[in-house]
Amino acid sequence: MKRLLPSLRAKKRYLAFELISEEPASRSDIVKEVMSSASSLLGDVTTSDCDIRVLGFENGKGIIQCSHTKVKQTRASLAALTRINGKRATLHVLGVSGTVKRATEKFLQDEGVFSS
C-alpha cells in the first residue's frame, strides 16, 4: 500500500505543557484526565476530531499531540482540567509547535522529555 503524500496527510500540532499539582501524577493519570476533560467540555465527536495524544511526560512536563485545526479546542479542554486523582491540578500550556523537535527545543530545554 502506498503512503500518502505529505500534502494529503493529517497535519498535527504539538503542545508543550507543565503540570502544576499538589502531588505528582503519572502519564496514565494525565491521559485519563485529559480525555475526560475534553469529552465533558467538547463532547465525544469533537474530542475525536481533536485526535489528542499524550506523547511524553517526565518531571512534570510533557508534550501533547493534536489536530492542527483543533488547537484552540484542545487548549480549552486542558484549561478545564482541575483535578487529577482527586487532587487539585492544572495543565499550563507552554507553547505550540509544528514538530516535536522544535517543541522540545523551544519549550522543554533541560527537561529530559524526548531527549536522547
Swiss-Prot record:
Enzyme class: hydrolase
Broad class of where this protein is predominantly found: cytoplasm
GO MF term list: ribonuclease P activity
Catalytic activity reported: Endonucleolytic cleavage of RNA, removing 5'-extranucleotides from tRNA precursor
Gene3D superfamilies: Ribonuclease P, Pop5 subunit
UniProt superkingdom: Archaea
InterPro entries in UniProt: Pop5/Rpp14/Rnp2-like, Rnp2-like_sf, Rnp2_archaea
Keywords: Cytoplasm, Endonuclease, Hydrolase, Nuclease, tRNA processing
UniProt record, GO biological process: tRNA 5'-leader removal
Keyword Nuclease: yes
EC numbers: 3.1.26.5
Any one cellular-component term (Gene Ontology): ribonuclease P complex
Subcellular location: Cytoplasm
Family, as annotated: Belongs to the eukaryotic/archaeal RNase P protein component 2 family.
Function: Part of ribonuclease P, a protein complex that generates mature tRNA molecules by cleaving their 5'-ends.
Record note on quaternary structure: Consists of a catalytic RNA component and at least 4-5 protein subunits.
Protein name (Swiss-Prot/TrEMBL): Ribonuclease P protein component 2
Organism annotation: Methanosarcina mazei (strain ATCC BAA-159 / DSM 3647 / Goe1 / Go1 / JCM 11833 / OCM 88) (Methanosarcina frisia)
Lineage, broadest ranks: Archaea, Methanobacteriati, Methanobacteriota, Stenosarchaea group, Methanomicrobia
